[in-house]
Amino acid sequence: ITVWALLKIKKHGLAYISCRKNHMAHGCCHDLRIDETSTYSEEELSLYSIGNLHVGKFGGTLNTLGTGIDAAERTSMLQQDFVIDNRDRAIKKLKWLSTAPSQLTFHFAYEAYLKGKEGENWLRNSKELADSKELCDECIMQMKKIKRQYKEIMNAGIADSEYELGLLGVIAWDAGQLNFLSRACMEQGYINKDECMICLDAAFKM
């Protein structure tokens, strides 16, 4: 999580995440890229737009199934940020993101944060993390990041409570990344629409 990523979600609210028509009509999305001819339903937009934090970061279109990110920038982003340059790598990455342990990282880090001083010991003694020292270490690192940034997040008005921080974190992290990458990989031709939809459903369930 980054403080300013969460702030952007908080600032634009559902307009940033969903870009729903009623928000657009009231001018909430004036600084965001939207397709005014989009005819997607509320249900479809709710499913497609979980990854819009990432889409907005790269100047994409928020209320479409595709990301709308410039092709050259999308290619560069996939290669440099995610080491995805073909179908096999795309499938491997998306499978990892859509199944444990990847999607558990924020959950464990956040739960450990709520446990205060006992958080790190709780992670190290977790049966679910016992088979992966790498994942356990990642959760500990992210827990410490939440601790460092919590006051700044509260002072900036990004979250009003620990509960709200937890909700924003899922969107900014696990579910958002899976949604975003599946849409980008579909546009890139690495996966087809049916495969993309499987990933979007998995992200939505997170």
Q: Where do the PLM segments sit?
A:
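Polar/charged low-complexity regulatory segments
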Residues: 2-180, 184-197, 202-206
